[in-house]
Amino acid sequence: MLTVNQHSGEALPQAWWATAFKQGIGAIEHTCLVLAPWRAPVPMTRAWCLWEMLCTEESGAQLTVQLPATETADFRRALVHDFDSIQRSVAAVDVRRAEAFEPADLEMIRGAVEAGAGYSVLNALVLRQLRTWIADSGLAALAELDASERSKSALINNLGVLLKAQGRLDEARSPPRAGPHVHAVRVPGSDVL
């Protein structure tokens, strides 16, 4: 489902984008962000995508991050074996460097961001949303590892750091689908959970 024909958006005033567009996203109650390629996510360089993430947050809608099937296996491997590459892939988000095909669209989006939340707030919001998704994906991946691999996986420590930074220590103490062979996430600077 689409809410706006972006090719005719220049006919709408900036105030519309700050109100009606956000209300449309809120009415739908859900935005799906297709993060591809995950190592250098194109949506993080596109002004429209970042604007939609802001509107999603401000309207109280749910954001779901999806990877294409062709990216999923590589992302899962990185969760377990190269967690830092995932952190690096999202750390470079900067709304000020985002682009749009139409200069008028870019000007409109920048104007709305400047008049509203501001660049720093939007950058922080996007990073928080992506880090939440990374943590959720990591918890799911940890639960799927077999017991012997799980107990030795660097993912335990990586998730501990990430969950601690997000204030989600309760989730570190109670991993999903806990069973007799599921190990709690380790949080550096504290006892093993």
Task: Please identify what each model-predicted range represents.
Residues 147-193:
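A detector of tandem-repeat and repeat-rich interaction/domain scaffolds
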Residues 1-165:
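The feature represents the membrane-entry module of six-transmembrane cation channels
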